Design a protein with these regions (language model features):
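Glycine-rich adenosine-cofactor-binding loop
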Residues: 182-227
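N-terminal charged helix/coil linker that caps or initiates catalytic domains
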Residues: 143-194, 415-416, 437, 454-461
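Conserved beta-strand-loop surface patch within small alpha/beta domains used
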Residues: 1-85, 92-160
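Conserved acidic residues
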Residues: 269-271
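Internal hydrophobic alpha-helix adjacent to the cofactor/substrate pocket in enzyme cavities
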Residues: 391-410
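A short helix->loop->beta-strand "cap" motif at the edges of active sites that frequently abuts
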Residues: 120-122, 263, 307-309
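E1/E1-like adenylate-forming module used to activate ubiquitin-like modifiers
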Residues: 267, 278, 283-392, 409, ...
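Glycine-rich phosphate-binding loop and adjoining beta1-alpha1-beta2 segment
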Residues: 220-260
Length: 461
């Protein structure tokens, strides 16, 4: 079992569980679920602290609370079909469950399962003074095992894998990476599952970099095939691929296999608007959005919010003057964190543009009719594209990812929520911090699996 929480959840837990008095404290969390054939994932929807003054006992080695404090939490979980997890602190830094913890949980969790009338596993976690989390699953019969991974989608991307997953040697092809970022970061990279949506101009270059940085698994999504017009910017594509109309995902999968660096690839030559594709992306540790479509960006942002996955969106805009000149060249990297601002609230697109893009997808005839009547604004389909510009954007995106898992900048990562680069006017370059939470995306925060999927009827179950 794995667990995901947002950076805001993590900060709230750290503030509550370590108030400065040296005593243990406790909180609970309501969680959505993602149940797949190969894993169970809990995603934190809401953190519910137990007030310090409500606890019966708080010492450096023990905390207890009245059962009445848990009742409203269980009521809410039962009504919404959510899981319940317990999180308490170990101020002394002991990194696993004590005998006292074992006894307390053996008494508490049977009532949790009984109240919620489910046999689906729950979890219990310990937070250490440095903010690290360790935990274990809890089944109805009291058995369980260490959580295989706990991840935090915050300004820094945090991942804690179980001890069994950490013991591995650095292969020869990764030694230069280890010299730059350390053995620990290389081991982390080899355990991550990263989704890349869009495998064309920027996406193919993002994939190339991730594979050569020894990512454990890549989930590639693109419904299109290689055409001759793509050969100027899709790395590893050939004229033979264009003649054969090979799927872009197949071309990149072939290239990664030829590298022989151990990266597993799951490729979908399908549209993002597919439950199977979205389910595969929902259990990724990071998502890269490398597409132009507005409705695709919106859907990926919503998925990232529902399953608490950090999203790095890559954008390129090259405006030609039509006479062989260039008006402006921009590249933009947006790092979108669950529970924070979104591509929508940052103005990457607006609701009118989203509605137009959705209409174009579902009914080209209706789109053309409304466009002709000036009810909607047209969507640009083809833009100028130059591989060197795409490379700069893709490199900035992957560097942003590396900085988030291994902070190396003088300024904190929160400073770089938005990075804009203007090649035609470098003085216009800017970095922006995270903004206010997006009211639209916050509705889906930590919801996990729903019926219909993501609460969208057009996606079905």
């Amino acid at each position: 079992m794995r667990l995901a929480l947002s950076g805001r959840h993590h900060r709230a837990l750290l503030d509550h569980l370590f108030p400065g008095d040296g005593n243990e404290a406790v909180a609970f969390a309501l969680c959505g679920r993602a149940r797949r054939s190969d894993l169970d994932l809990l995603v934190v929807s809401e953190v519910v602290p137990i007030p310090h003054e409500a606890c019966r006992v708080r010492t450096p080695h023990h905390v207890s609370w009245p059962g009445t404090a848990l009742e409203p939490i269980l009521q809410k979980a039962a009504a919404a079909g959510l899981a319940v997890i317990k999180i308490h602190s170990h101020p002394g830094g002991y990194p696993w469950f004590s005998d006292t913890d074992d006894i307390a949980e053996a008494e508490m969790f049977p009532s949790v399962f009984g109240w919620l009338d489910t046999d689906a596993p729950m979890a219990s976690l310990i937070m250490l003074p440095d903010g690290k989390l360790v935990g274990r699953s809890v089944r109805e019969d009291g058995s369980g095992e260490p959580l295989s991974c706990i991840r935090v989608a915050g300004d820094d991307f945090l991942y804690w894998h179980s001890q069994a997953a950490e013991a591995a040697t650095v292969p020869e092809h990764a030694r230069r990476i280890a010299q730059s970022f350390g053995d620990g970061t290389v081991q982390l990279l080899r355990q991550l599952r990263i989704g890349v949506v869009g495998c064309s101009g920027t996406g193919s270059i993002v994939v190339e970099q991730l594979a050569r940085n020894c990512i454990g698994e890549l989930v590639l999504v693109d419904s299109d095939h290689v055409e001759h017009k793509n050969l100027n910017r899709i790395v590893n594509s050939t004229a033979d691929d264009a003649d054969a109309e090979r799927p872009k995902t197949e071309v990149l999968q072939r290239a990664i296999a030829a590298m022989g660096l151990g990266t597993k690839v799951t490729a979908f030559n399908r549209d993002l608007m597919s439950v199977e594709v979205l389910q595969a992306l929902s259990t990724c540790d990071v998502l890269f959005g490398c597409m132009d479509s507005i409705d695709g960006r919106h859907l990926l942002n919503k998925l990232a919010s529902a399953y608490l996955v950090p999203l790095i969106d890559v954008g390129v805009r090259l405006d030609a003057d039509g006479a062989g000149g260039i008006d402006s060249i921009w590249t933009v990297v947006n790092t979108v964190l669950p529970g924070g601002s979104s591509l929508l609230s940052r103005g990457v697109y607006d609701m009118a543009a989203l509605e137009a893009a959705s209409l174009r997808r579902t009914s080209q005839a209706a789109y053309d009719e409304q466009l002709k009547a000036s009810y909607i604004k047209g969507i640009k389909v083809d833009r100028p594209a130059v591989i060197s510009v795409n490379m700069q954007a893709a490199a900035a995106a992957v560097d942003e990812f590396l900085a988030r898992i291994h902070p190396y900048r003088v300024m904190p990562n929160k400073t770089f929520a938005i990075r804009r680069f203007c090649l035609t006017d470098p003085d216009a370059n800017e970095n922006k911090e995270e903004g206010s939470a997006c009211s639209v995306m916050s509705r889906s925060l930590g919801t996990g699996d729903q019926m219909p999927f993501l609460g969208m009827p057009n996606l079905g179950d």
